[in-house]
Amino acid sequence: MTILEEIVEYKQLLLQNGYYQDKLNTLKSVNIQNKKSFINAIEKEPKLAIIAEIKSKSPTVNDLPERDLSQQISDYEQYGANAVSILTDEKYFGGSFERLQALTTKTTLPVLCKDFIIDPLQIDVAKQAGASMILLIVNILSDKQLKDLYNYAISQNLEVLVEVHDRHELERAYKVNAKLIGVNNRDLKRFVTNVEHTNTILENKKPNHYYISESGIHDVSDVRKILHSGIDGLLIGEALMRCDNLSEFLPQLKMQKVKS
């Protein structure tokens, strides 16, 4: 069993045990009407749009620095991030919906609930906790699940980042007409990253979609390697959580887009 399969199995167990229903019953609803649109930001931004992530750990990283997360969010916004991603998985990534709820009020930027969504109830909880965007991972969903969850999220006025790992998954994302597509540079079986995976996946990309490169981006040289793939933005977590000089580092990542 891969790490991803293990995580999905755990999510199914949480759904069966009433975890998400309990969250829906106990979390106070957060008004997200003042949140900016990430897609609008991409459309207006001549430089790469940055989704800056809040994370505490991952299955491959257990030693991320402890930060004042409210300050981290403030710094992200001040130094040019266009959206914030917040992990809500507790067991594997050290996040929570309570953290999402607390931090979303600290920024007017769009906030992505980053989790392993397989059921509409999880979308309800994400929205109630203050997310204005959700992540759907093509690899863990059937075509019907992907279509139904995508349409449900859109009906709830949420933006959707549809994550793909190979060209076949990219075609599946096109089938639901996903406006926002994330290319994950992580090998899901071995959980190792290769940033240039983005170049391979986007060789024959279609126009009228926005593309975000995710995972494995540690410095400016990594961005240069994938800039000419025609990406519109980056999702970066570990490098930003480790950085002690966001005022210098984050603006450097916002390179001019190169449309291919």
Swiss-Prot record:
Pathway assigned in UniProt: Amino-acid biosynthesis; L-tryptophan biosynthesis; L-tryptophan from chorismate: step 4/5
Keyword Amino-acid biosynthesis belongs to the record: yes
Catalytic reaction list: 1-(2-carboxyphenylamino)-1-deoxy-D-ribulose 5-phosphate + H(+) = (1S,2R)-1-C-(indol-3-yl)glycerol 3-phosphate + CO2 + H2O
Cross-referenced InterPro entries: Aldolase_TIM (IPR013785), Indole-3-glycerol_P_synth (IPR045186), Indole-3-glycerol_P_synth_dom (IPR013798), Indole-3-GlycerolPSynthase_CS (IPR001468), RibuloseP-bd_barrel (IPR011060)
Lineage: superkingdom: Bacteria
Enzyme type, top EC level: lyase
GO function term, MF aspect, one: indole-3-glycerol-phosphate synthase activity
UniProt keyword Lyase present: yes
CDD domains: IGPS (cd00331)
Keyword annotations of the record: Amino-acid biosynthesis, Aromatic amino acid biosynthesis, Decarboxylase, Lyase, Tryptophan biosynthesis
EC number: 4.1.1.48
Any one biological process term the GO annotation gives: L-tryptophan biosynthetic process
One Pfam family of this chain: IGPS
Gene3D superfamilies per record: Aldolase class I
Family: Belongs to the TrpC family.
NCBIfam families, per database record: PRK00278.1-3 (NF001371)
Name of this chain's protein: Indole-3-glycerol phosphate synthase
Lineage, broadest ranks: Bacteria, Bacillati, Bacillota, Bacilli, Bacillales
Gene, per the UniProt record: trpC
